[in-house]
Design a protein with these regions (language model features):
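Pre-NBD coupling/linker segments of ABC/ABC-like ATPases
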Residues: 1-9
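C-terminal boundary and immediately downstream tail of ABC-type ATPase nucleotide-binding domains
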Residues: 3, 234-256
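ABC family nucleotide-binding domain
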Residues: 10-233
Length: 256
């Protein structure tokens, strides 16, 4: 496994995965995964479905417990006690495949609810923050629409705004475009690119290779729960060293 020059090498690691193992019964979902995410970096996790990418993401904020190794957040091991784990989750925004919006709340209230219920922010201040975030993702005009009145791409942009409302240190994206119609994928990727340009630390599980190639600072290739290769996108997409990486990208028709 070759490591190319890392643009963010001088930055402190925000998340470190150290020989992480995760088992589901006898099935090994993660098999000795060692990677790190530096501050201000976009790290994309790619590879075939079922290779452990989403599992690693869920281990980052203790939605899943690990069976070996360590996950360090700002140098501190991820807590196993649920109350402390919740505090860690508050520092991370997570965007899921299927939006996970409250269907009975409009877009504005979906974004405002976290700061009110978790951070104890006043409703007025939370709604003011929520409106600014909806403006940021291009949906101020849809603030009073319910999820049923929004397209998939619009719902996912609301979900991104909701995650940002908690002012996270890290944003985790679990295949954020996989449930979208092709014509709405671009609007979500554009919001994510804007966050990257602003210096948000991001870990992204994605099948959007063009996004990974153009936006990521570091790309990690998974197969059968293992990291088969990691490096800058120029290495992964133009000069991969692992045969499995070449096979995977070739299967997708990626030609650099």
């Amino acid at each position: 496994m070759m490591n190319g020059e890392r643009k963010s090498a001088g930055q402190a690691p925000v998340v470190v995965y150290d020989n992480v193992r995760k088992l589901y019964g006898s099935f090994v979902a993660l098999d000795g995964v060692t990677v790190q995410v530096n501050k201000g970096e976009v790290m994309c996790l790619i590879g075939p479905s079922g290779s452990g990418k989403s599992t690693l993401l869920r281990c980052t904020n203790a939605l899943e417990t690990i069976d070996g190794g360590r996950v360090l957040i700002d140098g501190v091991p991820l807590p196993t006690e649920e109350r402390e784990a919740r505090k860690v989750r508050q520092r991370m925004g997570m965007v899921f495949q299927n939006f996970e919006l409250f269907p009975h709340k409009n877009a504005l209230d979906n974004v405002a609810i976290g700061p009110v219920t978790v951070l104890g922010m006043s409703e007025a201040k939370a709604r003011e923050r929520a409106m600014k975030l909806l403006e940021k993702v291009g949906l101020a005009a849809k603030a009073h629409n319910f999820p049923s009145g929004l397209s998939g791409g619009q719902q996912q942009r609301v979900a991104i705004a909701r995650a940002l409302a908690m002012e996270p240190e890290v944003m985790l994206f679990d295949e954020p475009t996989s449930a979208l119609d092709p014509e709405t994928i671009g609007e979500v990727l554009n919001v994510m690119k804007k966050l990257a340009d602003e210096g948000m630390t991001m870990v992204v599980v994605t099948h959007e290779m063009a996004f990974a190639r153009s936006v990521a600072d570091w790309v990690v290739v998974f197969d059968h729960g293992k990291v088969v290769e990691q490096g800058p996108p120029s290495q992964i997409f133009e000069a991969p060293t692992a045969e499995r990486t070449r096979d995977f990208l070739g299967h997708l028709g990626w030609h650099g």
